[in-house]
Amino acid sequence: MEKFLQEAKSASRVLSLLSGAKKNRVLKEMANALRVNKADLIDANALDMADGKKNSLSLALMDRLLLDEVRIEAMAVAIEEIAALKEPVGRVLDGWVTEAGLKIEKVSIPIGVIGIIYESRPNVTSDTAALCFKSSNVCVLKGGKEAQNSNEAIAKVLQATLEKNSLPKSLISLVPDSSREGVAKLIKMDKYVDLIIPRGGEGLIKYVCDNATVSVVKHDKGQCHTYIDKEAILEDAIKIAINAKTQRPGVCNAMETLLVDSAIAKSALPLIKAEFDKANTKLKGCLKTQEIIDVESVTEEDYDTEYLDNILNMRVVDGVEEAIEHIVRFGSGHSEAIVTQNVTTAEKFLNSIDAAAVYLNASTRFTDGGSFGFGAEVGISTNKLHARGPMGIEGLTTYKYKIYGSGQTR
């Protein structure tokens, strides 16, 4: 592990000297290489899918694991979009002259070597590799064992493109030890690794945060809520709720709990249930919900569960204050939404909720780098430092000060 990370650290110096034009050219070649090698990627993914079926992975996890021509094309397009983004490093963020006559510039620079630990989704391999390369960071990737064949195939294609351009393949590499012990070693290698970004289940995040000596930006679970206020346009509210839960249930920005104002519950809940029944969503509700519609009972534990599946909790609340109290208690700081036409109620919700993204009259499903115009993201940070929300190339940079003098002493 140490030799592997030494090579990654050494490679970071090579990357720091690459021009933006060269990086963009290599990224475009990577995108094309994914298209050219799509048959090999699909074959490798088929091995993972077969293993997943044998190991009884959930339908949501199987969906996250799948690679097909459409998803590979989306991966290639994502890399091209990253290439088209403004150069993130070497930018003068601020500048001034001191009383001593020193000219100071605050300049964006790469973080260095970034270890990314993730589960299930093979597209994370290409997305994060491209984002790190664009921002002049070396990436060390540790994907989930369920996607090992897919991740290795994708990394092989990207590394071949690097070598074709006389660049070390260690700029983008997979951790050689895929065991839990490998993760344990990686997160303590602060001599070589500058940042760890874990994205995955609650157990993974907790383990990394509790044991890492390397700095961590965590991408924690998405315990997302939508609150339908008494002054919502119900047709819009139902459309938003259906999208937030059913468009892709197995992702972190999908809604897990729907809160409905008690003032409209009797008329709204039957209509809401009818639409979720069409989507075959399993519904769980509080006692007040069960008095109005036929659903299973919800527990306190359910409110704290990220299902990543087509299952939804429902709760009737007495106005925006109780909705906020529920979210404060059970939310994970990811994405929260309110549907209302009342400006005062909306602002109260948006200002009171402490989350990376808060929505008015829109689905929580928009919390991702592509939708925010970042190209892609290495994940959605639930940290407050140093990045929050969809973490694109800006979040993969830090800064230093350049000071220009003319013989000044102190």
From Swiss-Prot:
GO MF annotations, alphabetized: glutamate-5-semialdehyde dehydrogenase activity; NADP binding
* Key words of the record: Amino-acid biosynthesis, Cytoplasm, NADP, Oxidoreductase, Proline biosynthesis
Q: What is its main location?
A: cytoplasm
Q: Where in the cell is it found?
A: Cytoplasm
SUPFAM superfamilies referenced in this protein's UniProt entry, alphabetically: ALDH-like (SSF53720)
| Domain of life (superkingdom) | Bacteria
Q: Name one GO cellular component term.
A: cytoplasm
Q: Reaction(s) catalyzed by this protein?
A: L-glutamate 5-semialdehyde + phosphate + NADP(+) = L-glutamyl 5-phosphate + NADPH + H(+)
Which pathway is it part of? Amino-acid biosynthesis; L-proline biosynthesis; L-glutamate 5-semialdehyde from L-glutamate: step 2/2
User: InterPro entries under this entry?
Assistant: Ald_DH/histidinol_DH, Ald_DH_C, Ald_DH_N, Aldehyde_DH_dom, G-glutamylP_reductase_CS, Glu-5-SA_DH, GPR_dom
User: Which EC number(s) are documented for this chain?
Assistant: 1.2.1.41
EC main class here is oxidoreductase
One Gene Ontology term of the biological-process aspect is: L-proline biosynthetic process
Q: What does this protein do?
A: Catalyzes the NADPH-dependent reduction of L-glutamate 5-phosphate into L-glutamate 5-semialdehyde and phosphate. The product spontaneously undergoes cyclization to form 1-pyrroline-5-carboxylate.
Family the UniProt entry places it in: Belongs to the gamma-glutamyl phosphate reductase family.
The protein's name: Gamma-glutamyl phosphate reductase
